[in-house]
């Protein structure tokens, strides 16, 4: 719950506690909060052990689908689609449809023919902005 709270935030909370509660009531409030958290943790641990005792082996059967849900929660949308709908075949995302490594398409020729060295070769291929004419394509950004 407080995984993202750093030392700076804790210092702000302590200063706010000093201002709101005052120095005489702050230690008591901290003790009360720590005791309440400890008691809640004991209740949760007791409930878990009681469920484990009452359900026996069924408790592990209940935990199995929950662990699968946790694994799914950590997946990216692309990984979930690849695993469950495409049976692990991510060629639709990568564009590598050829499984044996041989390309069925003939080798493509370059768009611009190379010119002979000379004054015409000094003209840059890129526009004045310094960017090439083609925009990079990111399959994960869609």
From Swiss-Prot:
Chain intervals with Basic and acidic residues compositional bias: 99-112
Record key words, sorted: Cell membrane, Membrane, Protein transport, Translocation, Transmembrane, Transmembrane helix, Transport
Annotated Polar residues bias: 133-142
Keyword Lipid biosynthesis attributed: no
Residue spans crossing the bilayer: 2-22
Residue numbers spanned by region Disordered: 89-142
Major localization class: membrane
Single Gene Ontology BP annotation: protein transport by the Tat complex
Name recorded for this polypeptide: Sec-independent protein translocase protein TatB
Function: Part of the twin-arginine translocation (Tat) system that transports large folded proteins containing a characteristic twin-arginine motif in their signal peptide across membranes. Together with TatC, TatB is part of a receptor directly interacting with Tat signal peptides. TatB may form an oligomeric binding site that transiently accommodates folded Tat precursor proteins before their translocation.
One GO cellular component term noted in the UniProt record for this chain: TAT protein transport complex
Subcellular location: Cell membrane
Entries under NCBIfam families matching the protein: tatB
Assembly and interaction partners: The Tat system comprises two distinct complexes: a TatABC complex, containing multiple copies of TatA, TatB and TatC subunits, and a separate TatA complex, containing only TatA subunits. Substrates initially bind to the TatABC complex, which probably triggers association of the separate TatA complex to form the active translocon.
GO molecular function: protein transmembrane transporter activity
Keyword Transcription regulation among record annotations: no
Bilayer topology term: Single-pass membrane protein
Family from the record: Belongs to the TatB family.
